[in-house]
Amino acid sequence: RRTFPDGVRVVELSGVTDPGQVEQAVAHAFAGVGPGGTAAALAARVADLRALLILDTCEHLVDPVALLVPTLLAAGSRLRVLATSRQPLGIPGERIVPVPPMRVPDPDRPADPAALAGCESVALFVDRVAAAVPGFRLTRENAAAIAELCARLDGIPLAIELAAARVPALGVARLAA
């Protein structure tokens, strides 16, 4: 809270298909900037903020994001931006932090829920499913399927999140089949 006293704003860009909607999506995260807010209006709004802006899943919108972010940062603000993307934005001052694959379950060990709970890829999968399916947890019944899925997805966080998002519609066993 001390680092970002004005809060953390998360803008999920995976659902934005029109590059022209990037500014609107970011404006929505900052109260006081109405729909159709321009980059200049956004920059004015964030000029005095000590906040973190997270732009999630922006690989399909690299160009408009790469135009907007420097404008926001140049506003004299203490705004910080964290962009998640499979490719760099290519803007001055950008720091690239690769996210390596997570540890996956050992295929030669039985799928014991207690042992699997400590595996980071399994923990991510279960956490993401539980966010969409209240009460979902790692059990003896689903442990083998979850272990297999995480191993098949090579521990890649994005792949695990995308698979977990399909569980409400398909179920774990069907997804693993």
Segments predicted by a language model, with ranges:
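Aliphatic-rich helical/repeat scaffold segments used for oligomerization and domain docking
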Residues: 1-177
